[in-house]
Swiss-Prot record:
SUPFAM superfamilies, sorted: N-terminal domain of the delta subunit of the F1F0-ATP synthase
Task of the protein: F(1)F(0) ATP synthase produces ATP from ADP in the presence of a proton or sodium gradient. F-type ATPases consist of two structural domains, F(1) containing the extramembraneous catalytic core and F(0) containing the membrane proton channel, linked together by a central stalk and a peripheral stalk. During catalysis, ATP synthesis in the catalytic domain of F(1) is coupled via a rotary mechanism of the central stalk subunits to proton translocation.
Source organism of this protein record: Shewanella piezotolerans (strain WP3 / JCM 13877)
GO molecular function, one term: proton-transporting ATP synthase activity, rotational mechanism
Main subcellular localisation: membrane
Entry protein name: ATP synthase subunit delta
Length: 177
C-alpha cells in the first residue's frame, strides 16, 4: 500500500495544484473518481496490465472515459499511461480528495458504533473532534454490533477505541502478559 501511495502522490499533487490554480477542484474530484472507477472495472484490468503500447492504452482509456474527462485530465492519463501507472488511478483519486480536505481544513472521521447514534450524539462528537483536531469534521457513521457498546473513531492518523470489545481485548492482553 505504501508503495502505491508513493507512486500515486506526485500525480495527485500535480493534478491538485493544477485544479487549485484553475479553481476546478470539485470538477477534478469527479473526473478522477470516474477514471478510477474505469480503471477498477474488471474488463479494463487485464488491459492495464497487458502488453498494449502506452499510447494505445491511453487512447483506449480516454475513449472509454469519453466526455467525463476534460483535455487536461486526458493529458494526465496519457502521462500516467506512458509511465505504466494507470493502475494507481484509484490511489491518485483518493490522495486528491485527501489533499482537498487538507486544503479546506477538513477531515473525514469514520465512526463505528455498536448502536445507531442520535443526531445529538453525532453533533457532540463532531464538535469535540473539531475542537481536538482544529478542523471541520465530517462524520461517516456505521454500525457494528460486535463492538458490544461504545464507539471506534478514526480520523486521519487518530484512532480512538472506546468500545467494550476493545477494552476487553486490552484487558485480555494485559492479563496474558
Amino acid at each position: 500500500m505504501a508503495e502505491i501511495t508513493t507512486i500515486a502522490r506526485p500525480y495527485a499533487k500535480a493534478a491538485f495544484d493544477f485544479a487549485l490554480e484553475q479553481n476546478a477542484i470539485e470538477n477534478w474530484v469527479e473526473m478522477l473518481n470516474f477514471a478510477a472507477l474505469v480503471s477498477e472495472n474488471e474488463t479494463m484490468q487485464p488491459l492495464l496490465s497487458g502488453s498494449l503500447a502506452s499510447n494505445q492504452l491511453a487512447e483506449l482509456f480516454i475513449g472509454v472515459c469519453g466526455e467525463q474527462i476534460n483535455e487536461q485530465a486526458q493529458n494526465l492519463l496519457k502521462v500516467m499511461a506512458e509511465n505504466g501507472r494507470l493502475v494507481v488511478l484509484p490511489a491518485v483519486a483518493q490522495l486528491f480528495v485527501e489533499m482537498q480536505h487538507e486544503y479546506a481544513k477538513e477531515v473525514e472521521a469514520q465512526v463505528v458504533s455498536a448502536t445507531e447514534l442520535t443526531s445529538e450524539q453525532q453533533q457532540e462528537m463532531s464538535a469535540s473532534l473539531e475542537k481536538r483536531l482544529a478542523r471541520k469534521v465530517k462524520l461517516n457513521c456505521s454500525i457494528d454490533a460486535s463492538l458490544i457498546a461504545g464507539v471506534i473513531i478514526t480520523a486521519g492518523d487518530l484512532v480512538i477505541d472506546g468500545s467494550v470489545r476493545g477494552k476487553i481485548s486490552r484487558l485480555s492482553d494485559t492479563l496474558q502478559s
